[in-house]
């Protein structure tokens, strides 16, 4: 959201501004606000203008034609619009204008109105200090400066005016109060501010209605503003209140057809069979507004079929369905290995393909519907324990074939290697279980409204009240290096990445365990490979004793692998599958090690690469954080803190993703995409935008030199503990090392300062 100057001081300009939300293509004009038209049916739902609004605009245009502008007033209003504080002070102090008589002769629009609608906090501050009336009405809708600022989502102006006597309960001629206008702005930060600073204190009701009976939730649903809908529902907004035409929030949400809005409303218990005064339910509205697909998507996501009836669940508990998903790969892999071991490969491929389709269909139709539905993310196999089940099934088959086939043949010749593999397998099983159930470092959710208000106040004081620094889901301040996780429904401190192989996030408290896990996994695969070669050699000797000659195996020749393919294809296939896994595991170890040396997380590396591509495209930047900090505000903000947080900021285009191909999904799941990015970084290959990636990552704010970075990662902050304990144990609290000092990652709002000599130690 930008502070765009309104340079024409004519009241007719404001009529358009007052009647349209700047940040939404769908303003309140799109819903009838004037007298009801009984002849209007839902089949002709279009932009229905209020008779009163038409009259306001027509009359205003006529009046403006007859008004002779006062050059002095025009200069003053223009200065207020542009934030020219020097000119405003000169005119007020020079007695050229009186601060409470600075409105035009037609609609009495004051300098405070113009400064408010243009986010000119310095001018607003000065005018109020000179006695300007913060509750003066002006414009075609007789709105206050508070209304003008709220309509455009200017949080800092609204905050200042409220602290200096502005009345949040006042309404304009449309009957809109501060909460209605805040919702119309579609700035989630302003909505949160009003909810906690006004509604929570009892000054306004979250379900307050305008003259047409429309609540803030209804407006948000119509605008397709899923963020505001979610916050209002969390604040207790009533989903059953209907307007004067019998429309509930779900009805208007169906008109707009925003799937996320519909999901939130349906999950909160909205009745999709309820009819309007015209006798139409959501299904009829969806047909007429061509939003059937969105409604059906929301219904299926929420556990209903296309007709609105509950989908049959084969499992009473969500955990049982997840357990079936988790164990399915073990059975599937066993069948696949058996097929290729005993039947013709071509026939096995056909059967395996059909089996894959059947398994996918069965999981999607019979198992996934039993999952619990929370939030807006669709439940898919990619967001299920399926991949963690693939790993567990693979590990279990490796253990089975080693214990029952490989070990009996090789223990005599390789006793220590077998014991080593046993230890590694036990450790991998143990750490895997720990990682699946571990807390990655979730920052506690804030539920005390007083604490939330204080957090908002603190962020406003430093000009950082936006979605980058305040979590709109948990209502807590976001620490540096953190990220909100929809899986854990919490902000995860020092968030690294979501790992489908452990069905959990990797963060502050389990990152070190994850590194042990993948390292042991790679060691285990290599040890298993060595024992399998010994096993195949023993098989070859056994068959040679029986005078059975071994033929060539194409590219394998007369190697031990050929013996395995000939004499125990099942074990050979399990080994081949394990070796395939070792490729992406090795690349993951390489990527993670590189990022540890660089002192950054996987999430920070991704953001850095995306930011580079976005900046290299056309140099245009976009505000995705709902930040409305006025120009020149808060000069006391520390530059280091602001710069340190830039690598975590959302980047242009980060929400616009290209369609994923099957190959791309596989690369992402296995982490090979990260491997390619790191290789380019290591050897200094330029990216598609022509930037040298090394020059970008060399400026990472959390890079304190590779030695310091490695120590920060591998050592806990408990300096009194033995060294072995500091290395082997993961952080159990929110405290860890950063640049050699103990920091609380739950409250990390400023990074430790780099020493001058650390610059030469970078990697």
From Swiss-Prot:
Keywords: Acyltransferase, ANK repeat, Endosome, Golgi apparatus, Lipoprotein, Membrane, Palmitate, Repeat, Transferase, Transmembrane, Transmembrane helix. GO terms for molecular function: protein-cysteine S-palmitoyltransferase activity. The active site is at residue 499. It is a multi-pass membrane protein. Residues 1-70 are annotated as: Disordered. SUPFAM superfamilies: Ankyrin repeat. The chain crosses the membrane at residues 321-340, 346-363, 384-404, 416-436, 513-533, 570-590. Residues 1-11, 34-44 have a biased composition (Polar residues). GO terms for cellular component: early endosome membrane; Golgi membrane. Residues 1-320, 364-383, 437-512, 591-763 are cytoplasmic. Its EC number is 2.3.1.225. It comes from the Eukaryota. Belongs to the DHHC palmitoyltransferase family. AKR/ZDHHC17 subfamily. Palmitoyltransferase specific for casein kinase 1. This is Palmitoyltransferase AKR1. It comes from Saccharomyces uvarum (strain ATCC 76518 / CBS 7001 / CLIB 283 / NBRC 10550 / MCYC 623 / NCYC 2669 / NRRL Y-11845) (Yeast).
């Amino acid at each position: 959201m930008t502070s765009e100057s309104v340079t024409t001081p004519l009241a007719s300009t404001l009529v358009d501004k007052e009647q349209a939300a700047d940040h939404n293509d769908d303003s309140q004009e799109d819903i009838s606000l004037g007298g009801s038209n009984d002849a209007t049916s839902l089949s002709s739902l279009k932009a229905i203008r209020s008779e009163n609004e038409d009259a306001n605009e027509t009359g205003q245009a006529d009046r403006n034609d007859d008004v002779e502008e006062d050059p002095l007033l025009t200069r003053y209003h223009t200065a207020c619009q542009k934030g020219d504080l020097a000119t405003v002070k000169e005119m007020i102090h020079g007695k050229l204008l009186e601060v409470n008589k600075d409105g035009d002769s037609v609609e009495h629009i004051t300098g405070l109105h113009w400064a408010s609608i243009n986010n000119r906090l310095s001018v607003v501050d000065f005018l109020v200090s000179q006695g300007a009336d913060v509750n003066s009405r002006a414009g075609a809708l007789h709105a206050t400066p508070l209304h003008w600022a709220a309509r455009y989502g200017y949080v800092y102006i609204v905050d200042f005016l409220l602290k200096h006597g502005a009345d949040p309960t006042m309404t304009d001629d449309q009957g809109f109060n501060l909460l209605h206008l805040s919702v119309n702005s579609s700035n989630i930060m302003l909505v949160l501010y009003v909810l906690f600073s006004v509604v929570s204190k009892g000054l306004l009701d979250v379900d307050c209605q305008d003259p047409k009976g429309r609540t803030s939730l209804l407006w948000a649903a119509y605008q397709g503003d899923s963020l505001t809908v979610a916050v209002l529902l969390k604040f207790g907004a009533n989903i059953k209140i209907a307007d004067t035409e019998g429309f509930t929030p779900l009805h208007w949400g169906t008109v707009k057809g925003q799937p996320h809005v519909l999901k939130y409303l349906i999950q909160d218990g909205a009745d999709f069979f309820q009819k309007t005064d015209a006798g139409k339910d959501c299904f009829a509205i969806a047909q007429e507004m061509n939003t059937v697909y969105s409604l059906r998507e929301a219904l299926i996501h929420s556990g209903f079929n296309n007709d609105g009836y509950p989908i049959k669940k084969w499992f009473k508990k969500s955990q049982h369905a997840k357990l079936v998903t988790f164990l399915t790969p073990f059975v599937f892999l066993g069948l696949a290995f058996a097929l290729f071991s005993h039947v013709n490969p071509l026939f096995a491929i056909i059967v395996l393909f059909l089996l894959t389709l059947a398994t996918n269909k069965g999981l999607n139709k019979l198992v996934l519907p039993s999952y619990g539905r929370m939030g807006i993310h669709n439940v898919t196999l990619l967001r299920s324990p399926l991949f963690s089940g693939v790993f567990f099934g693979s590990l279990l088959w490796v253990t089975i074939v080693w214990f029952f086939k490989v070990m009996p043949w090789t223990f005599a010749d390789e006793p220590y290697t077998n014991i080593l593999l046993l230890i590694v397998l036990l450790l991998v099983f143990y750490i895997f279980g720990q990682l699946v159930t571990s807390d990655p470092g979730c920052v506690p959710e804030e539920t005390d409204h007083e604490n939330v208000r204080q957090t908002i106040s603190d962020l406003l004081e430093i000009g950082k009240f936006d979605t980058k620094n305040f979590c709109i889901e948990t209502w807590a301040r976001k620490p540096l290096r953190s990220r909100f996780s929809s899986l854990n429904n919490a902000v995860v401190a020092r968030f690294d990445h979501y790992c489908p192989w452990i069905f959990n996030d990797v963060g502050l408290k389990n990152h070190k365990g994850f590194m042990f896990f993948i390292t042991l996994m790679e060691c285990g695969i290599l040890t298993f490979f060595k024992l399998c070669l010994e096993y195949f050699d023993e098989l070859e000797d056994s068959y040679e004793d029986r005078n059975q000659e071994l033929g060539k195996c194409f590219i394998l020749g007369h190697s031990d692998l050929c013996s395995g393919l000939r004499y125990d294809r099942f074990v050979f296939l399990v080994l081949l599958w394990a070796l395939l896994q070792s490729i992406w595991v090795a690349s993951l170890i390489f990527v993670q090690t590189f990022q540890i040396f660089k002192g950054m997380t996987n999430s920070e590396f991704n953001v850095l690469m995306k930011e580079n591509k976005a900046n290299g495209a056309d140099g245009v930047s976009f505000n995705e954080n709902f930040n409305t900090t006025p120009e020149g505000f808060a000069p006391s903000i520390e530059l280091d803190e602001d710069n340190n947080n830039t690598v975590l900021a959302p980047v242009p285009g980060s929400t616009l993703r290209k369609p994923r191909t099957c190959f791309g999904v596989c690369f992402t799941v296995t982490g090979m995409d990260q491997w390619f990015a790191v290789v380019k970084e290591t050897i200094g290959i330029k990216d598609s935008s022509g930037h040298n990636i090394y020059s970008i990552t060399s400026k990472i704010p959390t890079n304190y030199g590779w030695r310091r970075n490695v120590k920060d990662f591998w050592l806990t902050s408990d300096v009194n503990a033995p060294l072995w304990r500091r290395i082997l144990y993961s952080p159990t609290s929110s405290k860890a090392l950063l640049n050699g000092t103990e920091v609380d990652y739950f409250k990390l709002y400023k990074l430790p300062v780099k020493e001058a000599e650390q610059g030469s130690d970078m990697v």
